[in-house]
């Protein structure tokens, strides 16, 4: 699968995703689509088929993004899972015969198991970081980010309105307000972020710089909202 297209589009679940979906649907056939586990049911709802769906969380709540049956929509999608995702994730994928693979990151215990033949790759802190690094490994020349807000919307929403766990983030905007303020996308003022999103953003900035310097990959943040990602 290396080099099958020049451009990778990474779909995350920030508040700005909703407005990007019509354009993504229009150009889906012209790029390779990588999506986060939380974006997968949203893309299915809008009949936008990803090439890869990635997941790395160990909690059962994340597994529920796969507790569904989209029938023919899932054909030819590759689900890439970090090797210690919650067991419910693989159970749900196996139930509907979806194609998945387990991958490991570099860690002392993993190395001790001597699973070298299966390979390793660094995955970062979030599933979006994991998507970005896989896109590098698959030798895409351009990486496009959408839905990668890493900040609250002006109305306080943490994720796009189609996100199934919005209720789990109620009160977070009030909790974080004025604590993690950062530069907005396009230098359009300031936005409110969170401690975790700030970590993810810094991780992204390192990855973007590394991709540009060492692999000559150009990254385009097309989120049109959220926090500015330097690089």
How would you name each of these model-derived features?
Residues 1-34, 41-231:
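Metal-ion/cofactor- or nucleotide/acyl-coenzyme-handling active-site neighborhoods
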């Amino acid at each position: 699968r290396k080099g099958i297209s020049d451009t990778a589009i990474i779909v995350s679940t920030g508040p700005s995703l909703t407005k990007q979906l019509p354009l993504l649907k229009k150009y889906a056939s012209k790029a390779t689509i990588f999506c986060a586990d939380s974006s997968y049911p949203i893309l299915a709802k809008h009949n936008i088929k990803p090439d890869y769906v990635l997941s790395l969380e160990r909690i059962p709540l994340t597994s529920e993004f796969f507790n569904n049956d989209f029938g023919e929509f899932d054909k030819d999608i590759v689900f890439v899972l970090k090797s210690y995702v919650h067991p419910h994730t693989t159970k749900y994928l196996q139930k509907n015969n979806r194609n998945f693979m387990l991958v490991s990151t570099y860690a002392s215990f993993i190395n001790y198991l001597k699973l070298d033949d299966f390979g390793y790759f660094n995955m970062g802190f979030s599933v979006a970081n994991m998507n970005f690094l896989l896109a590098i490994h698959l030798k895409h020349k351009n990486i496009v980010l959408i839905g990668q807000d890493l900040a609250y919307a002006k109305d306080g929403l943490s994720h796009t309105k189609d996100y199934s766990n919005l209720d789990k983030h109620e009160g977070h905007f009030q909790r974080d307000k004025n604590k993690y303020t950062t530069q907005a996308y396009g230098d359009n003022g300031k936005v409110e972020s969170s401690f975790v999103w700030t970590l993810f953003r810094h991780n992204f900035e390192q990855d973007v710089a590394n991709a540009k310097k060492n692999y000559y990959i150009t990254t385009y943040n097309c989120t049109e909202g959220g926090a500015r990602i330097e690089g």
